[in-house]
């Protein structure tokens, strides 16, 4: 009853009224065969941007989304994350999985401090040789390329840290760097937090 139906028309010589009907529910999607599990540590932006981030991260196959309370996160945005938004976020995940056909069951964890986020990553992950952690940074000093960081062939888990609208503070970058997160910078672009 709730199944989305899509009508596709076959474009070939023959009967013009031949068609295929397709419908997918998130529960019907087969588990991911990907050998890499992705985590997104997102510093808390405005609520509307967080919804867009959750949708796009789910469509891309992110396994865990961890909202991080950072120095540049505005207090009202943090409060919005901790309030009744959880049900809305779960609905967004379900809809994004249906739309994209993503086989990854995305989980949104509770908002945590930066120290808690680092501890979570270190506790939940494997040996250093089997994981990689990057932080997208708008400054280009002492950064590496994505290829340099992710070129190891035995990586099983990847953490991606993204700042809020104000970015990530220098002290937070230092804390992340000291704990194995490698700052990366795209030479030609500074991306918005929701991109």
What residue ranges belong to the model's regions?
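A mid-sequence, solvent-exposed acidic-amphipathic segment
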Residues: 112-161
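RNA substrate-binding interface of SAM-dependent RNA methyltransferases
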Residues: 30-132
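N-terminal positively charged helical leader segments and presequences
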Residues: 1-29
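Short acidic/polar active-site loop segments enriched in Thr and Asp
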Residues: 63-64, 156, 182
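A C-terminal functional module that forms or caps the active site or interfaces directly
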Residues: 155-175
